[in-house]
A protein has these predicted regions:
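Intrinsically disordered, low-complexity linker/loop segments enriched in Gly/Pro
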Residues: 1-40
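C-terminal functional regions that serve as terminal interaction/effector modules
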Residues: 26-28, 33-37, 41-194
Length: 194
């Protein structure tokens, strides 16, 4: 199982405070959190009866099969509300629907709560770390700023919204720091990916 089971379990539990959406079609489980989405094969989850699957059973009371639900933590436990698959599908398409991607790699740097990643052209993107498994080998970023991680062997995919400062909303100091980072090359693009 290539995905980080403990990290995904923590992300699911943390996300229920604001609301976590689950979409399961029997083969894959798609979890939609705030600014991230993970797609995990159900076969990989069923190999273990604790971790992520244990958290889902605790929240739902059963193993998800063909469900679309929203889970919110309340005082006594978890509130589970059915959702329309069409509504969730629109949100999933917002993450996964963009076909054009560019290669992007982690720099090893952080700014605040964001991990910084760099495109080949030098552009830096901050990525929300929640639920992330930074050991996945291949990364790409869509034109809309969605960072994709993928492991072709297991089908794990994690999508997260990228962040870039904007001249109309961010301070000049933030923009200056960002420009300074983009002048340098933080990734060895000639080295093979591990």
């Amino acid at each position: 199982m290539a995905f980080d089971d403990a990290a995904l379990e923590r992300a699911l539990r943390a996300e229920t405070k604001h609301g976590l959406t689950l979409y399961c079609n029997g083969e894959t489980l798609t979890a939609l959190g705030y600014e991230w989405m993970a797609v995990v094969p159900m076969d990989g989850l069923r190999e273990r009866l604790r971790g992520t699957l244990g958290a889902l059973v605790e929240m739902l009371g059963y193993i998800p099969e063909n469900d679309t639900v929203r889970i919110v933590r309340n005082k006594g436990g978890y509130l589970v509300q059915p959702e329309l698959p069409e509504t969730v599908g629109e949100e999933i398409c917002g993450y996964a629907g963009e076909p054009h991607t560019e290669e992007i790699r982690p720099t090893g740097l952080r700014m605040g709560m964001n991990f910084l990643m760099q495109k080949r052209n030098g552009e830096i993107v901050g990525v929300v770390p929640r639920g992330a498994n930074l050991d996945v080998r291949r990364y790409a970023i869509t034109a809309g700023g969605i960072v994709r991680q993928e492991d072709g062997d297991t089908g794990e995919r994690l999508y997260r919204r990228g962040y870039r400062p904007r001249e109309d909303t961010d301070s000049e100091a933030t923009l200056r720091k960002w420009r300074h980072l983009e002048v340098m090359s933080w990734c060895d693009w000639d080295a093979p990916e591990e």
